[in-house]
């Protein structure tokens, strides 16, 4: 029998009674949220709305995004990244398992000096991909051109946020490059590796 989403006690400031809320709502109230699945439109919209709401609520207190994701849809991930740059509070990113593909792009989008990896975390970068299997020739060409533009944008962001030269980032993005937490720190994808 599944246990569902655990409930935890919560008391709002100034209220006498404790109410039981699901654990995610409790964590959201502490400005902690999670990307623990493949990136798609739904999770992207949820994270974006949370960041905007919490930044309106208090624009000086940091937000914390914990990441354990295999990646997913590029445009949805870029929307999360753009929102992180747009909101006023710093967004601290914490890799706690795997940040692969577009999830590593989100990880690198955290506030500089506030991008963290757990000691056994893994980070993987590569170029964006698409499937052209059933496309007409004209569609194939248009999609390939769009993919090249997206790759250039992602490369530019990695260069800006890691401090690595463009040739290093371009070379790394030609294939799947997996990094340990310390390798990701040396590469500039994270700023700090937590101690064991």
From Swiss-Prot:
It catalyses: Hydrolysis of proteins to small peptides in the presence of ATP and magnesium. alpha-casein is the usual test substrate. In the absence of ATP, only oligopeptides shorter than five residues are hydrolyzed (such as succinyl-Leu-Tyr-|-NHMec, and Leu-Tyr-Leu-|-Tyr-Trp, in which cleavage of the -Tyr-|-Leu- and -Tyr-|-Trp bonds also occurs). It comes from the Eukaryota. It comes from Draba nemorosa. The keyword Zinc does not apply. It holds the Pfam family CLP_protease. It is found in: Plastid, Chloroplast stroma. Disulfide bonds: none annotated. The gene is clpP. Belongs to the peptidase S14 family. SUPFAM superfamilies: ClpP/crotonase. This is ATP-dependent Clp protease proteolytic subunit. Component of the chloroplastic Clp protease core complex. GO terms for molecular function: ATP-dependent peptidase activity; ATPase binding; serine-type endopeptidase activity. The active site is at residues 101, 126. Its EC number is 3.4.21.92.
């Amino acid at each position: 029998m599944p246990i569902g989403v655990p409930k935890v006690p919560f008391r709002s400031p100034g209220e006498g009674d404790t109410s039981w809320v699901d654990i995610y709502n409790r964590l959201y109230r502490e400005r902690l949220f999670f990307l623990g699945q493949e990136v798609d439109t739904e999770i992207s919209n949820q994270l974006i709305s949370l960041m905007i709401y919490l930044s309106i609520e208090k624009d000086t207190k940091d937000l914390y995004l914990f990441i354990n994701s295999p990646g997913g849809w590029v445009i949805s991930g870029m929307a999360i990244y753009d929102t992180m740059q747009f909101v006023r509070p710093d967004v601290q990113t914490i890799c706690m398992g795997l940040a692969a593909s577009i999830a590593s792009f989100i990880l690198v989008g955290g506030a500089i000096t506030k991008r963290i990896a757990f000691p056994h975390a893994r980070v993987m970068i590569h170029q964006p991909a698409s499937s052209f299997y059933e496309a007409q020739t004209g569609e194939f060409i248009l999609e390939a051109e769009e993919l090249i533009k997206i790759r250039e944008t992602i490369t530019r962001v990695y260069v800006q946020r890691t401090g690595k030269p463009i040739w290093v980032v371009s070379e790394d993005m030609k294939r799947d490059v997996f990094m340990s937490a310390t390798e990701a720190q040396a590469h500039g994808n994270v700023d700090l590796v937590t101690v064991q």
